[in-house]
C-alpha cells in the first residue's frame, strides 16, 4: 500500500462519506471503493461497517485509521525537517477563508509571500464559514480564517484579530454628516443586515435588541460584498466590520460612523487541525498573519470619509 492509499482511507473516514472522501483525494468514487476493498483483502479484515448510513468504522478500521493518520503525520514532519536541512522555504500553503476576511488584505499577503518565499505557493479558497471548517477537518486546507472561531475535538483556534464594527452609510444618507451616533439615531432607520444564520448577523441583532433599538429591516444578505453594495446604493444603513471596507471608505463610496458606547467587534481566528504538522512555508505564513494583525490601523475618526 502507498501513501496515497493511506491518505484515501483517512480522507474517507474524516468525510464520513465515500464519494466526498474520494473527491478530496482526487480519485473517482469507484476507484476509491476498489482501493478500500483491496486494502480489506490484503489485511484480511473489514475496515468499514457498510450496513449503517453513514458507515461506521470496525475495530480493525479504527486501528487502521490511527495507523494511516500517524504515518501521514510522520511524512509531513519528515518533509518539514527536510526543508529545514535544505535551508529553503518551499511547499504549498493551503488556506480556506470566509469571504469577508478582507480580500485586499489577502492580496497584500500573497505579494509578501511571493517576496519572502519565491519557491512557495499560496492557495486561497473563499468559502462559507461551515465549509471552511470542513476544509480544515478533511485536510483540504492547512489553515482556515473564520469569524467567531470555535474549537472542538478536531480543531484548535489561534486568536488573530478583532475588527471594529461601526454604522456604515452612503455619503448621501442623513446620518453620514455625524461624527458619532447615539444608539437612538438608528431607530426606525432602513437597515440592511447579515443573514441570521451568520454569527455576525446574530451579534448585530443582539446589540440592537439590548440597546432597545427597533430598525426597519429591508434586506438581508449572506456576504459582505452584496450587503455593502446595497448600502452604497442607498437601500439603508448597516453595522459592519470596518476593516474590510477601507477601500470603499477612502474612495468616498461609504461613510463609517462609530456608535457611542458600542464595543461591538468581530473576532477573527486562525483554525487548524489539532496536532497538525505544518511545512516551513505554512509556518512563515502564520507569522505573516500575526504581523498583519499587529499592523496599526487608522483611528476610527480617520476612517470616516465625507
Please provide the spans of the model-predicted regions.
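Secondary-structure junction motif
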Residues: 190-211, 278-282, 286-287, 292-304
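Alpha-helical linker/hinge and terminal dimerization helices associated
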Residues: 42-43, 64-86
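Flexible hinge/capping segments at coil-to-helix
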Residues: 152-165, 169-191
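A late-sequence structural motif
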Residues: 105, 255-298
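Hydrophobic hinge/microswitch elements
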Residues: 128-133, 137-141, 146-147, 199-257
Amino acid at each position: 500500500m502507498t501513501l496515497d492509499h493511506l491518505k484515501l482511507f483517512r480522507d474517507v473516514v474524516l468525510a464520513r462519506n465515500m464519494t466526498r472522501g474520494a473527491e478530496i483525494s482526487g480519485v473517482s468514487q469507484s476507484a476509491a471503493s476498489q482501493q478500500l476493498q483491496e486494502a480489506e483483502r490484503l489485511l484480511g479484515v473489514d475496515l468499514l461497517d457498510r450496513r449503517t448510513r453513514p458507515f461506521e468504522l470496525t475495530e480493525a478500521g479504527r486501528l487502521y485509521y490511527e495507523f494511516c493518520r500517524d504515518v501521514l503525520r510522520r511524512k509531513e514532519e519528515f518533509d518539514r525537517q527536510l526543508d529545514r536541512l535544505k535551508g529553503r522555504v518551499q511547499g504549498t500553503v493551503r488556506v480556506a477563508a470566509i469571504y469577508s476576511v478582507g480580500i485586499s488584505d489577502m492580496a497584500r499577503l500573497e505579494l509578501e509571500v511571493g517576496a519572502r518565499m519565491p519557491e512557495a505557493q499560496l492557495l486561497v479558497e473563499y468559502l462559507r464559514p461551515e465549509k471552511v471548517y470542513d476544509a480544515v477537518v478533511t485536510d483540504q486546507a492547512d489553515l482556515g480564517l473564520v469569524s467567531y472561531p470555535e474549537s472542538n475535538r478536531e480543531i484548535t483556534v489561534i486568536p488573530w484579530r478583532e475588527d471594529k464594527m461601526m454604522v456604515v452609510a452612503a455619503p448621501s444618507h442623513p446620518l453620514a454628516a455625524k461624527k458619532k451616533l447615539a444608539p437612538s439615531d438608528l431607530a426606525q432607520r432602513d437597515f440592511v443586515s447579515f443573514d441570521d444564520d451568520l454569527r455576525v448577523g446574530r451579534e448585530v441583532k443582539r446589540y440592537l435588541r439590548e440597546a432597545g433599538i427597533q430598525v426597519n429591516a429591508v434586506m438581508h444578505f449572506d456576504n459582505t460584498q452584496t450587503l455593502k453594495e446595497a448600502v452604497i446604493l442607498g437601500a439603508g444603513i448597516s453595522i459592519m466590520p470596518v476593516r474590510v471596507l477601507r477601500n470603499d471608505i477612502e474612495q468616498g463610496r461609504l461613510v463609517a460612523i462609530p456608535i457611542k458606547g458600542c464595543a461591538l467587534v468581530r473576532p477573527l481566528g486562525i483554525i487548524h487541525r489539532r496536532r497538525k504538522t505544518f511545512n516551513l512555508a505554512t509556518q512563515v505564513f502564520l507569522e505573516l498573519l500575526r504581523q498583519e494583525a499587529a499592523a496599526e490601523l487608522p483611528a476610527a475618526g480617520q476612517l470616516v470619509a465625507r
